[in-house]
């Protein structure tokens, strides 16, 4: 008995789920075709359908990867980092999971992601896995005049006049802080003590004389300096407010809140002193107004935080503290537990001592805090053996408690510091290597008219301009590769089908 062998196409048509009019054996064979990728001498093999999962990437787009095809060896050659390609190929094989190899630095792997054009989504996923904190976008005003004024006062590195304004602002802040400190010197208070004719009075509380300039003398040098500083602070604040892109977001910025805190005490103090009536002294209200004015004037010391607007170091420190709030909270919580435990222990250990310096547990809180932070003032010391043992354990526990979150805080500081320095270096490099016709680029014009900008966006704009020249060279390289393939006639069929 003889059984005739049918055509494979007929057998495929007879199978359920494979209609004859939709099944294409050549297309299935093409998708399962192997591709050889040579990374600096290390060969990788995969299938075309694996790369085709991400057609927008360098390896997934046949036209893009054709520039790197070597017809002599019938493979794609990339002179790139070899250890990184394990993770790049796994990205295609796993359907989008990106994991950095342990032996590959962060900056090198980031460059490989950009080279293989895995996209912004893959880059953001990689940064999140590595613990990167996304840089927030900084909005810009849509009006051209407001944008120029905003850049002038908010971005000192944007132009020469902006740097001059920043220098003037820093000088005014320093003068204000120095004046705030100098006016408390005894020599100036002694001089003011003789100025009864100009409205300066001294008040006595609990047998102690407190010198305070109750009524501000408008000829006093410190008042004149303070007034000039407030005029500059107010002018700067109002200009920023009218030029800001978002009035609601303006008051949520911590730096603007510091500006308000630096200005308000002057006007409250001035208004209180001008509104004070002479008969208030007989009503006993001067003591209350003096205490209120002292608290308000104390707020002036917060002007020193205005320097953080012009200091990268203070900004990095603030970002570090903000990112380390969880660790700082744990540190305070551990210290709180330790203070309760050791203050209770030292109180009961010293309870039988007549000359004990720990009359109660709350009184021992101060000793526990000083001991756990290894300060050790010595104003309160245990005298019994049990108390000394508790003190030793308190100091050791304090050292261990404080040392635990320190590495995390230091790591956050290093991250923000390196991100800032690398961003400045990359921005300087892009400015040097960028083409001179950048202002005429349509992409750049479009970006400049946008409502938001960030440091990463600025770098992408510059990279896009630089890539325009690279695309021209790549097209020439592609033409050269095709010419070489036609000349050598090596596997020309595979090369054309791959395209």
Curated annotation (Swiss-Prot):
MF (Gene Ontology): delayed rectifier potassium channel activity; kinesin binding; outward rectifier potassium channel activity; potassium channel activity; voltage-gated monoatomic ion channel activity involved in regulation of postsynaptic membrane potential; voltage-gated monoatomic ion channel activity involved in regulation of presynaptic membrane potential; voltage-gated potassium channel activity
Entries under InterPro entries matching the protein: BTB/POZ_dom, Ion_trans_dom, K_chnl_volt-dep_Kv, K_chnl_volt-dep_Kv1, K_chnl_volt-dep_Kv1.2, SKP1/BTB/POZ_sf, T1-type_BTB, VG_K_chnl
Bilayer disposition of the protein: Multi-pass membrane protein
Covalently lipidated residues, kind S-palmitoyl cysteine: 244
SMART domains: BTB
Superkingdom assignment: Eukaryota
Keywords: Autism spectrum disorder, Cell junction, Cell membrane, Cell projection, Disease variant, Endoplasmic reticulum, Epilepsy, Glycoprotein, Intellectual disability, Ion channel, Ion transport, Lipoprotein, Membrane, Palmitate, Phosphoprotein, Potassium, Potassium channel, Potassium transport, Synapse, Synaptosome, Transmembrane, Transmembrane helix, Transport, Voltage-gated channel
Record's comment on post-translational modification: Phosphorylated on tyrosine residues; phosphorylation increases in response to ischemia. Phosphorylated on tyrosine residues by activated PTK2B/PYK2. Phosphorylation on tyrosine residues suppresses ion channel activity. Phosphorylated on tyrosine residues in response to CHRM1 activation; this abolishes interaction with CTTN. This is probably due to endocytosis of the phosphorylated channel subunits. Phosphorylated on serine residues in response to increased cAMP levels; phosphorylation is apparently not catalyzed by PKA. N-glycosylated, with complex, sialylated N-glycans.
Outcome recorded upon mutating residue 263 to T: In DEE32; dominant-negative mutation; loss of channel function
Site (described: Important for normal, slow channel gating): 252
Residues bearing PTM Phosphotyrosine: 429, 458
Side of membrane Extracellular, spans: 183-221, 276-289, 348-361, 382-388
Phosphoserine modifications at: 434, 440-441, 449, 468
Sequence ranges marked intramembrane in UniProt: 362-373, 374-381
Regulation of protein activity: Inhibited by 4-aminopyridine (4-AP) and charybdotoxin (CTX), but not by tetraethylammonium (TEA). Inhibited by dendrotoxin (DTX). Inhibited by tityustoxin-K alpha (TsTX-Kalpha), a toxin that is highly specific for KCNA2. Inhibited by maurotoxin. Inhibited by kappaM conotoxins kappaM-RIIIJ and kappaM-RIIIK; kappaM-RIIIJ has much higher affinity for channels containing KCNA2 than kappaM-RIIIK, with the exception of heterodimers formed by KCNA2 and KCNA7 where the opposite is true.
Sites carrying sugar chains: 207
Spans annotated as S4-S5 linker: 312-325
Entry note about domains: The cytoplasmic N-terminus is important for tetramerization. Interactions between the different subunits modulate the gating characteristics. Besides, the cytoplasmic N-terminal domain mediates interaction with RHOA and thus is required for RHOA-mediated endocytosis.
Role summary: Voltage-gated potassium channel that mediates transmembrane potassium transport in excitable membranes, primarily in the brain and the central nervous system, but also in the cardiovascular system. Prevents aberrant action potential firing and regulates neuronal output. Forms tetrameric potassium-selective channels through which potassium ions pass in accordance with their electrochemical gradient. The channel alternates between opened and closed conformations in response to the voltage difference across the membrane.
Subunit structure: Homotetramer and heterotetramer with other channel-forming alpha subunits, such as KCNA1, KCNA4, KCNA5, KCNA6 and KCNA7. Channel activity is regulated by interaction with the beta subunits, including KCNAB1 and KCNAB2. Identified in a complex with KCNA1 and KCNAB2. Identified in a complex with KCNA5 and KCNAB1. Identified in a complex with KCNA4 and FYN. Interacts with the beta subunit KCNAB1. Interacts with PTK2B. Interacts (via C-terminus) with CTTN.
Family: Belongs to the potassium channel family. A (Shaker) (TC 1.A.1.2) subfamily. Kv1.2/KCNA2 sub-subfamily.
Name assigned to this protein: Potassium voltage-gated channel subfamily A member 2
Species in which this protein is naturally found: Homo sapiens
């Amino acid at each position: 008995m003889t059984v005739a062998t049918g055509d494979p196409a007929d057998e495929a048509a007879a199978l359920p789920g494979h209609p004859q009019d939709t099944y294409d054996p050549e297309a299935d064979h093409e998708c399962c075709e192997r591709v050889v990728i040579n990374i600096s001498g290390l060969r990788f093999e995969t299938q075309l359908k694996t790369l085709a999962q991400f057609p927008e990437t360098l390896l997934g787009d046949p036209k893009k990867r054709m520039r790197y095809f070597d017809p002599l060896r019938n493979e794609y050659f990339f002179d790139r980092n070899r250890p990184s390609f394990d993770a790049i190929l796994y990205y295609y094989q796993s359907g989008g999971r990106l994991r950095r190899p342990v032996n590959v630095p962060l900056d090198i792997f980031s460059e490989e992601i950009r080279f293989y054009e895995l996209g912004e989504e893959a880059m953001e996923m990689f940064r999140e896995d590595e613990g990167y904190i996304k840089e927030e976008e900084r909005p810009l005003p849509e009006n051209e005049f407001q944008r120029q004024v905003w850049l002038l006062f908010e971005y000192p590195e944007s132009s020469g006049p902006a740097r001059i304004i920043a220098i003037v602002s820093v000088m005014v802040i320093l003068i204000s802080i120095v004046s705030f400190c100098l006016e408390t010197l005894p020599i100036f208070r002694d001089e003011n003590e003789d100025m009864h004719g100009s409205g300066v009075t001294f008040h006595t509380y609990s047998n102690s004389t407190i010198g305070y300039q109750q009524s501000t003398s408008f000829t006093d040098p410190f008042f004149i300096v303070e007034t000039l500083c407030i005029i500059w602070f107010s002018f700067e604040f109002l200009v920023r407010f009218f030029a800001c892109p978002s009035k609601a977001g303006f008051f949520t910025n911590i730096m603007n809140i510091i500006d308000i805190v630096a200005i308000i005490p002057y006007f409250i103090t001035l208004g209180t002193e001008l509104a004070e009536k002479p008969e208030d002294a007989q009503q006993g209200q001067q003591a209350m107004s003096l205490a209120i004015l002292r608290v308000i004037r104390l707020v002036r010391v917060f002007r020193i935080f205005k320097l953080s607007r012009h200091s990268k170091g203070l900004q990095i420190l603030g970002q570090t503290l903000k990112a380390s709030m969880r660790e700082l909270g744990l540190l305070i919580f551990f210290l709180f537990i330790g203070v309760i435990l050791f203050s209770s222990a030292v109180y009961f250990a010293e309870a039988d001592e007549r000359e004990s310096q720990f009359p109660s547990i709350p009184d021992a809180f101060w000793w526990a805090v000083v001991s756990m932070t290894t300060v050790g003032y010595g104003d309160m010391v245990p005298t019994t053996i049990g108390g000394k043992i508790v003190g030793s354990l308190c100091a050791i526990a304090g050292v261990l408690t404080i040392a635990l979150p320190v590495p995390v805080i230091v790591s956050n500081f290093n991250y923000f510091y390196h991100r800032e320095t690398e961003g400045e270096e990359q921005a300087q490099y892009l400015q040097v290597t960028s083409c001179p016709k950048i202002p005429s680029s349509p992409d750049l014009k479009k970006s400049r008219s946008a409502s938001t900008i960030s440091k990463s966006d600025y770098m992408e704009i510059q990279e896009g301009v630089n890539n325009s020249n690279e695309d021209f060279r790549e097209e020439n390289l592609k033409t050269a590769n095709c010419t070489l393939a036609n000349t050598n006639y090596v596997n020309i069929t595979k090369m054309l089908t791959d395209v």
